[in-house]
Amino acid sequence: MQFLAVAALLFTTALAAPSSDVNGIIRRANAFCPEGLLYTNPLCCDLDVLGVADVDCVVPPAKPSSCKSFGSVCASIGRKPRCCAVPVAGVALLCTDPIPAI
């Protein structure tokens, strides 16, 4: 029984690891949210509470291609671009600002 729990843990960890292309470059879901397990969901949020929790968050209506377009897509619906952990019932408990374009 313990073996199955450990095997399941290792399997899910392997699935969560970022993939890389043939040149060894790690692929990211987007270029404007930080890498890792947190803050990977781009959302447009209405109200920011103390810079951490965001209320009334929605998925961007159009897929942004850069940090600048992410900001303009969210601004078009009157919201702020945020990179959040998985939201629960419209409330994103852990959020951060997107990575600025260099």
UniProtKB/Swiss-Prot annotation:
Disulfide bonds join C33-C83, C44-C74, C45-C57, C84-C95. It comes from Hypocrea jecorina (strain QM6a) (Trichoderma reesei). Expressed in the conidia, vegetative growth and induction growth stages. Homotetramer. Further self-assembles to form highly ordered films at water-air interfaces through intermolecular interactions. Belongs to the cerato-ulmin hydrophobin family. CDD domains: hydrophobin_II. Its main location: secreted. SUPFAM superfamilies: Hydrophobin II, HfbII. One of its GO terms (cellular component) is extracellular region. Gene3D superfamilies: Hydrophobin (3.20.120.10). It is found in: Secreted, Cell wall; Secreted; Cytoplasm. Keywords: Cell wall, Cytoplasm, Disulfide bond, Secreted, Signal. The gene is hfb3. Aerial growth, conidiation, and dispersal of filamentous fungi in the environment rely upon a capability of their secreting small amphipathic proteins called hydrophobins (HPBs) with low sequence identity. Class I can self-assemble into an outermost layer of rodlet bundles on aerial cell surfaces, conferring cellular hydrophobicity that supports fungal growth, development and dispersal; whereas Class II form highly ordered films at water-air interfaces through intermolecular interactions but contribute nothing to the rodlet structure. Residues 1-16 form the signal peptide. Disruption phenotype: Leads to a wettable phenotype and to a significantly reduced conidial production. Also exhibits less biomass formation but does not affect the stress susceptibility. This is Class II hydrophobin 3. Induction: Expressed on carbon sources that induce lignocellulytic enzymes such as lactose, xylan, avicel and cellobiose, with the highest expression level detected on cellobiose and the lowest on lactose.
